[in-house]
């Protein structure tokens, strides 16, 4: 039985969306137990009774505008912190939150702890693509500044996840750069390219450009945290803007536009589903001693359900235990 700690109070739509997503997951997966951390009265308004769910009451929560590290240190009873603490104490196997990203990263690093040998855990998400085959990308903002060694390690981490969780036998790893030639990029990218070219444990295919990553250029895309976060936000904004513009054109285009949309409704639905990030789950702070996963702040119940599904897969495949052994065979997860 997998025990998953869930911060019920984090995110724009908490606790309703969080709890409803938990209800769906409990109905679907019989091998999980959920610990919900937060305001018990508010949680019960949406919770379906189930013997595999428990509530740990707390009135304290971390707000979106709280300074991350300070919040973790001062708000010891916050729902997010208690969930991370449960993982540290082995009362839970993983923790999920849709709350303050920086605070969850801090809780992951300072409470759950990183695997020995991992210099900088990276924030990694499985992203949709136009081909229908998702790709993993990291770092998406856990670290604003990185060295070439960090990028080298991100490539190993991302390849490991793609292979062991997503089932890709030989993941193609690409380095995000401003051109595909090996001479492209600044000193960071050039140094990272040399390191990745010599790394025998991964299938490094060279540099990839931002315009290529949504078209299946690589299974794993490696970037420094600042660049990765900027690209992520650009992809999200472009997707939302495209759908909004398309909807506006249909609604304001008269009868012909509406008729065309009706005839294309199945195609349009398929397009929307292809670009739906929620079905891929949350962003994993990969390189820690247990799964710490961030849902999007605006997550609905569907996104929460898929994040729990993702964490369940991580626990089923024992990817963290395998990662510990890969980086330091003598260390045990604690």
UniProtKB/Swiss-Prot annotation:
InterPro entries: FA_synthesis, Phospholipid_synth_PlsX-like
Gene Ontology BP term (one): fatty acid biosynthetic process
The protein's enzyme class: transferase
Alphabetical list of Pfam families matching this protein: FA_synthesis (PF02504)
Oligomer status and interactors: Homodimer. Probably interacts with PlsY.
Protein's recorded name: Phosphate acyltransferase
Subcellular location: Cytoplasm
Gene3D superfamilies according to UniProt: Isopropylmalate Dehydrogenase
Organism: Streptococcus thermophilus (strain ATCC BAA-491 / LMD-9)
Keywords of this entry: Cytoplasm, Lipid biosynthesis, Lipid metabolism, Phospholipid biosynthesis, Phospholipid metabolism, Transferase
Enzyme Commission (EC) number: 2.3.1.274
Pathway: Lipid metabolism; phospholipid metabolism
Cellular-component GO terms for this entry: cytoplasm
């Amino acid at each position: 039985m997998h025990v998953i700690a869930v911060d019920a109070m984090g995110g724009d739509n908490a606790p309703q969306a969080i709890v409803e997503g938990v209800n769906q997951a409990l109905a679907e997966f019989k091998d999980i137990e959920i610990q919900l951390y937060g305001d018990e009265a508010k949680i019960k308004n949406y919770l379906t009774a189930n013997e595999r769910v428990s509530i740990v009451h707390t009135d304290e929560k971390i707000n979106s505008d709280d300074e991350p590290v300070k919040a973790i240190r001062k708000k010891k009873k916050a729902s997010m912190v208690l969930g991370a603490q449960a993982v540290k104490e082995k009362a839970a196997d993983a923790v999920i939150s849709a709350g303050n990203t920086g605070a969850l990263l801090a809780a992951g690093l300072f409470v759950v702890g990183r695997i020995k040998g991992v210099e900088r855990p990276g924030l990694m998400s499985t992203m949709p693509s136009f081909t229908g085959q998702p790709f993993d990308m990291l770092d998406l903002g856990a670290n604003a500044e990185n060295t070439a060694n960090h990028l080298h390690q991100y490539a190993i981490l991302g390849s490991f996840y793609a292979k062991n969780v997503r089932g890709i036998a030989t993941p193609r790893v690409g380095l995000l750069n401003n051109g595909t030639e090996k001479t492209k990029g600044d000193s960071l990218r050039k140094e990272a390219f040399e390191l990745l070219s010599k790394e025998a444990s991964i299938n490094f295919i060279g540099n990839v450009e931002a315009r290529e990553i949504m078209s299946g250029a690589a299974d794993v895309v490696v970037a420094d945290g600042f660049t990765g976060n900027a690209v992520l936000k650009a992809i999200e904004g472009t997707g939302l803007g495209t759908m909004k513009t398309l909807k506006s054109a249909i609604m304001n285009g008269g009868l012909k536009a509406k008729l065309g949309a009706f005839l294309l409704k199945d195609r349009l639905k398929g397009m929307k589903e292809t670009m739906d990030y929620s079905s891929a789950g949350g962003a994993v702070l990969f390189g820690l001693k247990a799964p710490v996963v961030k849902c999007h702040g605006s997550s609905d119940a569907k996104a929460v359900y898929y994040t729990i599904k993702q964490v369940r897969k991580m626990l089923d495949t024992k990817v963290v235990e395998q990662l510990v052994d890969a980086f330091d065979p003598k260390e045990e997860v604690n």
